[in-house]
Amino acid sequence: MRGLRAVEHHAPLGQALRDHLASGESASIDVLRSDGVSYTIESQEFFSIRGRLEALDKRAIRESRGRVLDAGAGAGRHSLALQEAKYSVVAIDVSPLCVEVMQGRGVEEAHVADVFDLDCEEFGEFDTILFLMQSIGIAGSLFGLERLLISLRPLLRPGGQILLDSSPLAGPHSPNRDSSDGVLDGIDVTFSYRGSRGESFSWLYLDEEALAEVAGRLGWALEVLDRTAAGEYLARLGRAEG
C-alpha cells in the first residue's frame, strides 16, 4: 500500500460504490486487517441481497416491522428491499458518497449521520433498527457496543427491536480476544481503492456469547434467529420494559 493517498476511513468504499453506480461494473476494494489478514471486497455485494448472506438478509427483512432505521446502509440494498415491501425506512451512513449512491439508486430517505449521535427529535423513533452486512462492527469494541446500545434505547418505540448479523473470528484465541482479561476488542481495518488508502478504524467481530453478555447486562433480550454454516448469525435484541 506504499504511496497511496491517505483519506478518511470510509472514502475508498464510498468511491468504489459511486464508480459501480456510474459504470454498472463491480469495483474491488482491498482490505487489510491488523492481524495480517488481507482480502478483496467486490462492490457488487453492496448492491444486491443475493449472495453469501442472502438467507440472513431475507430473514431480517421478513422480521422487520413498523418504521425502520437502516444503520450503516452502504449502497442501500436493504433499504431498497424494504421500500419495495412498503416499509417506511430511513437509511443512514457516515459516508457522504454512500448516501449519494443510495439517493441515486432511489432510496427515498437517506442521510449522512453517525448512528452513535442520532437525535431522536430530528429522526424520530423506530420500531426496527437494522445493522446488516455485519455493520454492528462499527461499535469497534465491547465498550463501544455498550455505548451504542445505550444510545439506541431512546430511538426505539416500546416493543421495538434491533436486528443484527455478525460473526466471530476463528476460534477463542483469535487476535481480537485480549489474553489478559478475555475482553473481545476490535481489529483495525484499512480500506484501499484506486490509489487511496483510508485511515484505519476498529471493527468488532462479535460472537454470540459476547453479544449475549453485553446485551443481558444492559437489559436487552437476545434471540438468535438464524445461522449460516460458516458461523454468521442473525440476532434480535428486544428492549426490556420497566
Tell what function each PLM region has:
Residues 7, 11, 15-21, 31, ...:
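SAM-dependent methyltransferase
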Residues 43, 47-67:
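Conserved alpha-helix/loop element of class I SAM-dependent methyltransferases that forms part
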Residues 72-76:
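Class I SAM-dependent methyltransferase "Motif I" SAM/SAH-binding loop
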Residues 95-96:
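Conserved SAM/SAH-binding beta-strand->alpha-helix loop
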Residues 106-117:
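Conserved SAM-binding strand-loop segment of SAM-dependent methyltransferases
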Residues 126-146:
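A short SAM/SAH-binding and catalytic strip from SAM-dependent methyltransferases
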Residues 144-158:
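A short glycine-rich, Lys/Arg-flanked "PGG" loop and its adjoining helix->strand segment in the class I
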Residues 220-242:
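Core SAM-dependent methyltransferase catalytic element
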